[in-house]
């Protein structure tokens, strides 16, 4: 059998004709032409298609916060909160779009000055042509949104909405949203093992909890952020445990051996929201480079 010649053949471009070289150049140019640029508005449209603004709570201010959306996206920085450090990070990375979970502008602004960090961010974002958009309670309520991501992290099965659902009509058709989710663990856990699972999954040193449940935990309800309003619904739906980000002192009273309450921290409960943003943008807006912020914006420290 004749041995194969494995020597790498290097083309001699000096021997290529001018027509061949021009063809190669035009082919590359044609490829670049069809790699369509994406406008900021298209990214926002993709996010709002997934989580329409009508799903947000009446008190909320989700949606566009700052800027003009007609420019091409140079990069998207994804975060929970927009702080001055996050804005500086976007500038350093060359991102002209910041997608945040919590709205920068929540209350009415009566002036734009350097009085506080919100106003300073607005001014600096405009100066640097950076658009800021927030996806808040609309993506909390969306199917596949924040609460579904939390459920995924602790491997809940048969996940469905916990509280009331609503249907909104959009140009893309009907979208269903709801409050919180409920699902089942793959196997029952003792209460102390369940708390350990939360500590490991959400990288928290402590969990605020009521008296540990003496029966196994199988069915789990949850709501990211401040979800105490869904506690009684969780009990009515037969949940063994309820996870949320924060609760008031008096919310813990009266449920001993009825349900395991676990408050893991507002920031900690919503920390994976940026993964939801990234998935939407990369699937719907091909070519847009997404960066998840490296800045921990949690204003609460544990000493």
Please give the residue ranges for each predicted region:
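Polybasic, lysine-rich low-complexity intrinsically disordered segments
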Residues: 4-12
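Intrinsically disordered, low-complexity terminal tails and inter-domain linkers enriched
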Residues: 9, 27, 167-171
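Short, positively charged and aromatic/hydrophobic N-terminal segments
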Residues: 11, 20, 24-31
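Short polybasic linear motifs
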Residues: 16
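Active-site catalytic microenvironments in core metabolic enzymes, especially phosphate/sugar-handling
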Residues: 34-303
